[in-house]
């Protein structure tokens, strides 16, 4: 896979300056798996054609062995979550449609990226559907398209020097 071009510096916008409206991200635990899966099934884009394709065991492995996760709660319910692998891959970032537009995605993204950079990684990557709202979200945060994997768009975020 070719290296991505270096993104131009991004300026902070009003949403960045204000921070998330609502709860702040906290580390996820295996006790959060049901709530995370409920959010995953509620999304409008990137829906699972087979809800059984991602299992509780997948979430547990991601949280306990492969990486780390974060959740945002509102009124005692998980309304957004994200999971990143220690290898530098963003596995999931989803917000319940009823809670979109409140900065939860940006807050979760910031938590993931901060943790991954703390591991000494030089480049992060993810895949998403081309032309999706997720692609636009990641582009606005400095991610660059670097090719395709099984029809999905591969995007990378290099660490700034």
Map each language-model feature to its residues.
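A short beta-loop-alpha structural element at the N-terminal edge
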Residues: 23-38, 146
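Conserved GNAT-fold acetyl-CoA-binding loop/helix
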Residues: 33, 37-67
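Conserved beta-strand in the GNAT
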Residues: 71, 77-94
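A short, internal acetyl-CoA/4′-phosphopantetheine-binding micro-motif in the GNAT/acyltransferase core
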Residues: 93-101, 128
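Conserved acetyl-CoA pyrophosphate-binding loop and the N-cap/start of the following alpha-helix
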Residues: 99, 103-111
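Conserved beta-strand-loop-alpha-helix junction that forms the acyl-donor binding cleft
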Residues: 125-135, 151-156
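Conserved active-site tyrosine of GNAT-family acetyltransferases
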Residues: 138, 143
């Amino acid at each position: 896979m070719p290296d991505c071009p270096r993104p131009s510096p991004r300026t902070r916008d009003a949403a960045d300056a204000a921070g998330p409206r609502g709860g702040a991200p906290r580390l996820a635990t295996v006790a959060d798996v049901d709530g995370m899966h409920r959010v995953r099934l509620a999304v409008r884009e990137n829906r699972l054609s087979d809800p059984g394709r991602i299992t509780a065991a997948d979430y547990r492995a991601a949280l306990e062995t492969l990486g780390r996760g974060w959740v945002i709660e509102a009124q005692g319910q998980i309304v957004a979550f994200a999971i990143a692998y220690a290898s530098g891959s963003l596995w999931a970032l989803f917000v319940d449609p009823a809670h979109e537009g409140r900065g939860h995605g940006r807050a979760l993204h910031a938590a993931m990226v901060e943790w991954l950079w703390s591991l000494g990684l030089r480049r992060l990557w993810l895949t998403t559907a081309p032309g999706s709202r997720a692609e636009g979200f990641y582009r606005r945060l400095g991610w660059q398209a670097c090719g395709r994997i099984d029809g999905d768009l591969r995007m990378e975020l290099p660490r700034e020097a």
